[in-house]
UniProtKB/Swiss-Prot annotation:
Belongs to the metallo-dependent hydrolases superfamily. Adenine deaminase family. GO terms for biological process: adenine catabolic process. The gene is ade. The lineage of its organism: Bacteria, Thermotogati, Thermotogota, Thermotogae, Petrotogales. Keywords: Hydrolase, Manganese. This is Adenine deaminase. InterPro entries: Adenine_deam, Adenine_deam_C, Amidohydro-rel, Metal-dep_hydrolase_composite, Metal_Hydrolase. GO terms for molecular function: adenine deaminase activity.
């Protein structure tokens, strides 16, 4: 049935499939409320006015909102299957998302991307999958797969994709490197997402010549305003580690608010349960002083228009009937969720079922940890006088660079006194035996080791510890369980969580995953760790495109100067 066939319904000559009565329609176009009937047929909005329906629902004064949109996220950060993630966020109002699968792609390449696409397309939401642009994230990083322009061309020929995922290698862009520009040229008619932390001036100008449209790495009002003045959309990010909403709010005003939208980027299961998803960002924006209808507009209409999602993000004739029934605006209590006019969630519970076990389970995804034999000596810090140290910044994925010298003689065990831990990355895709070693200040671990197969973005094994023995056995346990997070102390495994899907994702329900992560977090806090999100923070210490100093399996990398640097300075 086409919209032409719906004309008699729009004109009031025939009954609509569904009519909401006595509701308050949130008009995001004008940031106001319309109190009229809302008619729906064939999955689209017919209009508002006086209508009769085959089914009529009395909303008793409840609000009707467009479905929420997450403009940029990595599903893998939720650490649960896609269907489990959907069952969590759809009842919270998220009906559209733009997902960049570069985590699973770094592990399993095309196989991983297609695995996500197959499952995501069988869920009642608008699933927009990007083609990752940076697999690996840089030319030197050691990932499990490489997606060059040729492979991307194969992917977009075989499947439907929304755009090119965040272009993180800005150095490759501004220096005109063919390996990244070939991908950009191939995807020039698609949405191209950005990753531009602190880029400004002529460097930003050069970066934007690639047709990059948006950025979610902006952290200050001045940075946001410059990027907007140069044509970018700003995805205000509120994840588990990086929380930029409060700092960016002063930049949003009546003249420029249409250039801002919401994104979660990376959110852990505990935070999805305790806080929520895009609904949490709306509530937080309102509490920080933003008008409720404007906050909803950022999460709906602004996102749809910025991303080029036609007939989404608003309540208007011909738009998709992706709707939320909201009890009140103060707490944003979501009573019901409708996708294409069909109820898919009610009272916080999903009304649909999808089982990924019904789909193929590729061995490259479910057996992805392959390490060479390791020794305690691999984690020994070489003797020296002055050391280069990663300086961790609380609640941020950016780091600083520091230097440390022992006041007298070298003694590895004394690093802990100065709030310094050892950190290493162990290559886990091709058993090369590569191990990069460094030091980090600010994590606070006083005893033992923490290892994880989640290490953005190449997802080798990252391990942080106070001693070589615990670091070794923690890494070996990761290999034994084929991915996960492991805590070791006093030469024993204390606890762990298994992440068998690419070493990134659990097969357990989100509640169980959240409980286990809370248990693990309590253990590491008892071992002295200070950071609020220890496992996600650790995972980002290996991302060599976010300043300043990061660790890879090839050693310490200075992101701003684009060079590997030594651990021992003299």
């Amino acid at each position: 049935m086409s919209n032409k066939d719906l004309l008699p319904i729009a004109l009031g000559k025939e009954k609509a499939d569904l009519v909401f009565k006595n509701g308050k329609i949130i008009d995001v176009f004008n940031e106001k409320v319309i109190e009229e009937d809302l008619a729906i047929s064939n999955g689209v909005i017919i209009g508002f006015g006086k209508y009769e329906g085959k089914e009529e629902v009395d909303l008793e004064g409840k609000f009707i909102s467009p479905g929420f949109i997450d403009a940029h996220l990595h599903l893998e950060s939720a650490m649960v299957t896609i269907e489990e993630f959907a069952k969590t966020v759809i009842p919270l109002g998220t009906l559209t998302l733009v997902a960049d699968p570069h985590e699973i792609a770094n592990v399993a390449g095309k196989v991983g991307i297609k695995y996500f696409l197959t499952i995501g397309n069988n869920i009642p939401w608008n699933f927009n999958l990007m083609v990752p642009s940076c697999v690996p994230v840089t030319t030197f990083d050691k990932s499990g797969s490489v997606l060059n322009a040729e492979k991307i061309k194969e992917l977009i020929t075989e499947e439907n994709f929304f755009g090119l995922g965040e272009v993180m290698d800005y150095e490759g862009v501004i220096t005109g490197q063919d390996y990244i520009w070939d991908k950009i040229e191939l995807m020039k008619d698609y949405f191209i997402d950005g990753h531009a932390p602190k880029l400004q001036g002529k460097i930003l100008n050069a970066y934007l010549l690639a047709g990059i449209m948006a950025d979610h790495e902006t952290t200050s009002p001045n940075e946001a305003l410059e990027k907007i003045s140069k044509g970018m959309y700003i995805m205000v990010r509120e994840g588990s580690v990086t929380r930029d909403l409060q700092s960016l709010l002063p930049a949003i005003n009546d003249k420029n608010n249409c250039n801002f939208l919401f994104a979660t980027d990376d959110k852990h299961p505990e935070d999805l349960i305790s806080e929520g998803h895009i609904n949490f960002m709306i509530k937080k924006a309102i509490k920080l002083g933003m008008e409720p209808f404007r906050a909803i507009k950022l999460a709906t209409l602004n996102a749809a228009r910025s991303l080029g999602l036609h007939r989404l993000g608003g309540i208007a004739p011909g738009y998709k009937a992706d709707l939320l029934i909201i009890d009140n605006l103060d707490e944003l209590g979501i009573f019901q969720v409708y996708k294409d006019g069909k109820k898919v969630a009610e009272n916080g519970k999903a009304l649909f079922q999808v089982n990924s076990n019904n789909f193929e389970r590729p061995p490259t995804i479910f057996h992805s940890v392959n390490i060479a034999p390791i020794r305690e000596e691999d984690f020994k810090i070489p003797k020296g006088k002055t050391y280069r140290v990663i300086n961790m910044i609380q609640d941020q994925i950016i780091t600083g660079e520091d230097f440390f010298s022992f006041p007298d003689s070298f003694e590895e065990e004394r690093f802990i006194r100065y709030n310094i831990n050892k950190i290493a990355v162990v290559e886990r895709h091709k058993s090369t035996g590569k191990i990069g070693l460094g030091l980090i200040r600010g994590f606070g671990l006083e005893s033992g080791a923490i290892a994880s197969s989640i290490a953005h973005d190449s997802h080798n094994i990252i391990v942080l510890g106070t001693n070589s023995c615990d670091m070794k056995i923690a890494v070996e346990k990761i290999a034994e369980i084929q991915g996960g997070i492991v805590i070791a102390n006093n030469q024993k495994i204390v606890d762990f969580i298994e992440l068998p899907i690419g070493g990134l994702i659990s097969t357990d329900p989100i509640g169980k995953v959240s409980e286990k992560l809370q248990e693990l977090r309590k253990i590491v806090h008892n071992l002295g760790v200070k950071t609020n999100s220890p496992f996600m923070t650790l995972a980002f210490m290996g991302l060599p495109v976010v300043p300043k100093l990061k660790i890879t399996c090839d050693g310490l990398y200075d992101v701003e100067n684009h060079i590997f640097v030594s651990l021992v300075v003299n």
